[in-house]
Amino acid sequence: MQSLSVSPLTYTADRFAPQRRKTLRVRVGNRWIGGDEPILVQSMTTTNTKDIDATVFQTLELAKAGCELVRITTPTQKDSECLEEIMKKVRAAGCDVPVSADIHFQPRAAMEAVKWVEKVRINPGNFVDSKSATPRDYDDASFASGVQKVYDAFVPLVRAAKDRGVCLRIGTNHGSLSDRIMWKYGDTIEGMVESALEYLRVCEAEHFGEIVFSMKSSNPRVVVQAYRMLAARLDKEHKPYPFHVGVTEAGDGEDGRLKSSVGIGALLLDGIGDTIRVSLTEDPVHEIPVAKALVKLCDLSRIAPVPSLAESLDFYAFHRRKVPLLHLGGLAIGAREKIAVGAPDPGAESIPKGERRLEWTGTHDSHATRSIPTVWEPRSVDFAIATKHSLVALASSRLFSGLSDLPANLEIQVEDPAHLEKLPADVLSLPHVYWSCSISGEAGDNPVARYRHLNAWLARKGRPDPIILRGRSDGTPEGNMMLAARFGSLLVDGIGDLLYVSGPAGTKVCMHLGYDILQAAGVRRTKPEYVACPSCGRTLFDLQTTTQKIRQRTAHLKNISIAIMGCIVNGPGEMADADFGYVGGAPNKVNLYVGRDVVKKNIPEMDAPEALVNLIKEHGRWSEPEA
């Protein structure tokens, strides 16, 4: 297994003053992707493509909802042949939305599809090579032979696309890397990137540049790292092709929206992304307002820059920031402790005390914002100061003179990174300090960059102090998504030891939002994790109904992940991290997995949810719901 070499920071010009990545402008029908064009919102039909009228109807409904590009699955050549009639009917209805064909396994289907649509997506993991149940071994010669096979199979499609003015998307899926790529690069983001670049080299050999890339996974952290690495590689080689960004198999409801916000939002906030799709296990029309909201929320033109500092982070792998243990009353944060969750003091509000409990209320025995207390009791206390006020007064106060001798914690809340340089030197000698940034929620606020600046400044000062991520949501779905995008961007980089959420919705709602964001970012699990694909024409059972049934039976379980996948295209790969898998194996038949291994096959759809419950019980992972 080999590793790719990427310079420490090339995926964006400035992480503290983000601008949209400069890309080539690619034509798709009557629309453009990349360059200075607005970020384009797209979705995918869930109908059987051979049901031409149903597919046409859903395409028109998506266009009415504001979808700017519609993707249709074409798993076979017969499905691709249906595109001719579908396109005629869509255009006859007065709809000019560009259409993309989604291809897996079938170069012949791609050659048919390219005749009728404006864009064709291929998956490098299975267009020529594939993943087998028993991975084969390779050597350098057989690997090189595989590269030649890619050229031979792909070049006819490239030439046809070039002749017809059709765009190609080279769309890698983490769950379907081929055995050949896995042999050389392993199950890594390097493998995802190199898998795509093999196909780019074929395009370049044919002088074809109407290309869009994607790097998808059901894990938002993998998504962010893979797109960053691809951007770094392409920009280093002066090949700034545009990106289609998305988190695949995000699921449904608020969980699906938060997971998408963590992955897509974190990238958009760094200027990465030219077209997006939010993959929800719902009616695809529901995806459009979510995607449009993300684009609006992550508008970089409204975000103020923050002074840059050199960072010592690995932007392509997750490493949680190393900090010492700190006790906030009865709560331990930092070190190897789980990232904690805080919310405002509940007062008389009833708060649960189970796996999801209120771990910190964020209150201090004294909050020195406008004045510094000069007298205090010699006991363990928790103080806070805000940097916009006079810190010189802190250094000269009687409060400060005793802090270093007592088990007192001091929270320093940074409102402007420039204030950090004004901190008295003696403050940095205090033993029990933790840091946070205020978040105003106002237009132009850039908390992600301020937290990055704080983290870099602490590293430069040799202060591995805990950092509290403070955020506020107005309680709307959009407010929650914005918070997930901001927090997710930081959590992906290993920044944050406690997540504190406030807002008008109340302590319980804020607390659960904090836990949900941590789970969406993949850093702490406190309820079942569902990896559910959004359905498409390949789906072999009713995904939406089935997902709800499985949720109802298993929502009380703890520390378990369940994948619900409509077919075997990406199912076994994308659910690799899941404990149990529920995958369509044939029409109305389901295969059940434990980890990567299929253990039960061809279970009738009606019986499969109960069979999954029994499988969980057999492996000792079941518990009865609490009364």
Identify the role of each PLM range:
Residues 74-116, 348-350, 358-379, 392-397:
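N-terminal active-site wall of soluble small-molecule enzyme domains
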Residues 43-46, 51, 64-90, 124-145, ...:
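Glycine-rich, proline-tolerant flexible connector loops at the mouths of alpha/beta enzymes
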Residues 138-154, 159, 181-330, 407, ...:
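Catalytic alpha/beta core domains of metabolic enzymes, predominantly
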